[in-house]
C-alpha cells in the first residue's frame, strides 16, 4: 500500500447537499426553505436582535454604569517596575520614557508589589503606606 492508494472508507464522507436539484435529493422544489415568507426569498434575512416587532431585549433592559474619565489619566505602578527607570530620580515623564505607563497618564501611584532593588527619589508621585515604607527602607525618598 502506498500513500496515493489511501481512500476513505465507504460511507465515511457524505456528499454535498445541492438544494433545488430534484425531489429525489430531499431538498427539491422549496430547497428546505419552506413555503413563502421573508426567509424563503433570496436576501430574506432578519436583522440580528429583531423580535418580530416586539420591543427587543436590548431596549427592554435598563442602561447602567459609565466610564470614568479619571481612569484614563491615572495609573498604578508596582514597586518592582521602578527598576525599569534609568537614573535615580523617578518622575511621571521618566516612567513614560521607560514604557512603564501610557503616554496620556498624568497621575501615578506606586503600589507595594515586588522588591525595591535600589534607592530612588520619587518626584510628584504618590505611594501607598506599604510602598512608601519599602522605598524608604531601601534608602529612597519622596519629593513633591
From Swiss-Prot:
Gene3D superfamilies: 3.100.10.10
Region (Disordered): 1-57
Composition skew (Gly residues), residue ranges: 21-31
InterPro entries recorded: Ribosomal_uL15, Ribosomal_uL15/eL18, Ribosomal_uL15/eL18_sf, Ribosomal_uL15_bac-type, Ribosomal_uL15_CS
Residue ranges of the TM segments: none
Domain of life: Bacteria
An example Gene Ontology biological process: translation
UniProt GO cellular component terms: cytosolic large ribosomal subunit
The entry's keywords: Ribonucleoprotein, Ribosomal protein, RNA-binding, rRNA-binding
Coiled-coil residue spans: none
An MF annotation (GO) of this entry: rRNA binding
A Pfam family per the record: Ribosomal_L27A
Subunit comment: Part of the 50S ribosomal subunit.
Function, as annotated: Binds to the 23S rRNA.
Family: Belongs to the universal ribosomal protein uL15 family.
The protein, known as: Large ribosomal subunit protein uL15
Species whose genome carries this gene: Stutzerimonas stutzeri (strain A1501)
Gene designation per UniProt: rplO
